[in-house]
Amino acid sequence: MYQQRNVLDNVFYLGSSDRRLNLFENAFPVPNGVSYNSYLVVDEKTVLLDMVDKSVSKAFFENLEHALGERKLDYVVINHMEPDHTATLEELVYRYPEVTIVGNAKTFTFIKQFFTFDITNKTLEVKEGATLSSGQHTFSFYMAPMVHWPEVMVTYEHEHKMLFSADAFGTFGALSGNIFADEYDYKTEWPAEARRYYSNIVGKYGPQTLALLKKAANLDIAYICPLHGPIWREKEGISWIIDK
């Protein structure tokens, strides 16, 4: 049973939450669970931005199939190679053999180390500031090494000012049906989970995180779409999560 939600008319949220997990990365307690977020842009070309953990893969593929309809999947952008976002990559390529994998040089090094399937003629390598058009949407890519893995990058969609921020600006905590922070009392419900996530996941890479914040400051951002936690879309909410 599909559970997709619209971020915009042709941008879909395909993520799911795991409330059964006790320790995130076998290290950090998550008493309120955790969400694994993935996004799909349906345009002249279809673009999937990141994937999900194996634990929620069934729901993910149901959501993806429903959102695509009869369309093929043209691109999958990998902002972060950690297994909770790429464990489903091999199955994705099996289901959609014509898909092109978009990433940077380190992304493809990691894919070759993590998987055994052949990615020959299936890749599009991007560098700092490179762009990709899906038709009505233009994406730019910015490297964010060691936030918190060496291959990390973020993706900025120009027309609707959307930052797909990888693990940056995320939080612990499962989502309860709503996907936007402003659908919650976020100043009450999310501060502890946001701070705990930041301090445990990306905060220890202070200089690298500050470098990403400087890049983000130069972008006009209307939406922050992280890989964990709610989507931030109001100016007050975006300022709040960046400040936290």
List where the protein language model places each region.
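Short, hinge-like loop/turn segments at secondary-structure boundaries
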Residues: 118-122, 182, 242-243
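Metallo-beta-lactamase
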Residues: 5-9, 103-226, 231-234
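Long, charged amphipathic helices and adjacent flexible linkers at domain junctions
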Residues: 235-244
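Short, flexible loop segments at the rims of nucleotide/cofactor-binding pockets, characterized by
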Residues: 24-29, 52-54, 78-80, 139-145, ...
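Active-site neighborhood of phospho(di)ester-bond hydrolases with catalytic His/Asp-centered motifs
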Residues: 49-51, 73-81, 101-104, 163-166, ...
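Active-site metal-binding motif and surrounding structural segment of the metallo-beta-lactamase
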Residues: 44, 55-102
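Conserved beta-strand hairpin/beta-sheet module of binuclear metal-dependent hydrolase folds
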Residues: 4-65, 154-157, 161-165
